[in-house]
From Swiss-Prot:
Name this polypeptide is given: Ribonuclease P protein component 2
Catalysed reactions listed for this entry: Endonucleolytic cleavage of RNA, removing 5'-extranucleotides from tRNA precursor
Enzyme Commission number(s): 3.1.26.5
Compartment(s) where it occurs, according to its Swiss-Prot or TrEMBL record: Cytoplasm
Organism of this sequence: Methanococcus maripaludis (strain C6 / ATCC BAA-1332)
MF terms (GO), sorted A to Z: ribonuclease P activity
Gene giving rise to this polypeptide: rnp2
Description of how the protein assembles with itself and partners: Consists of a catalytic RNA component and at least 4-5 protein subunits.
Length: 130
């Protein structure tokens, strides 16, 4: 069995709060493709793989993106250059950057913190999705 890496050897991450201004409602897969294409166009395949972008949460028009700490500047510049999606204009505004999801939600998205176990209890009460 493999041991987990100690915290000093793990990849350092940053969380980015985004606001996407687009005339239609976007889904998570659209946001993922926009971010990856922007990174690919700006810094290539190697830069995109180093950045390791991961969409944590998205509720139109706001989202939370996880990225490698060293590649935050590349992400900022690549998203500022992204200007069209499906031949329609798009604008991606970075609201803020933090090292925890809790701080991103509270400080930039103004969503009060709710402990994870309470979220799970709410989902159990709603029942399974159909």
């Amino acid at each position: 069995m493999l041991k987990t890496l100690p915290p000093t050897l793990r990849e350092k991450k940053r969380y980015v709060a985004l606001e996407i201004i687009f005339e239609e409602e976007l889904f998570q897969k659209d946001v993922i493709s926009i971010v990856r294409n922007a990174l690919m166009n700006y810094s290539g395949v190697l830069g995109c793989s180093k950045a390791n972008p991961w969409l944590i949460d998205y509720n139109h028009p706001y989202g939370i993106l996880r990225i490698s700490r060293e590649e935050v500047d590349n992400l900022r510049s690549s998203l500022s250059l992204a200007n069209e999606h499906r031949k329609k204009p798009i604008n991606i505004h970075i609201i803020g950057i933090s090292n925890s999801v809790k701080h991103i939600r509270e400080k930039f998205l103004h969503v009060p913190h709710e402990p994870y176990y309470k979220v799970i209890q709410k989902l159990k009460k709603k029942g399974p999705k159909k």
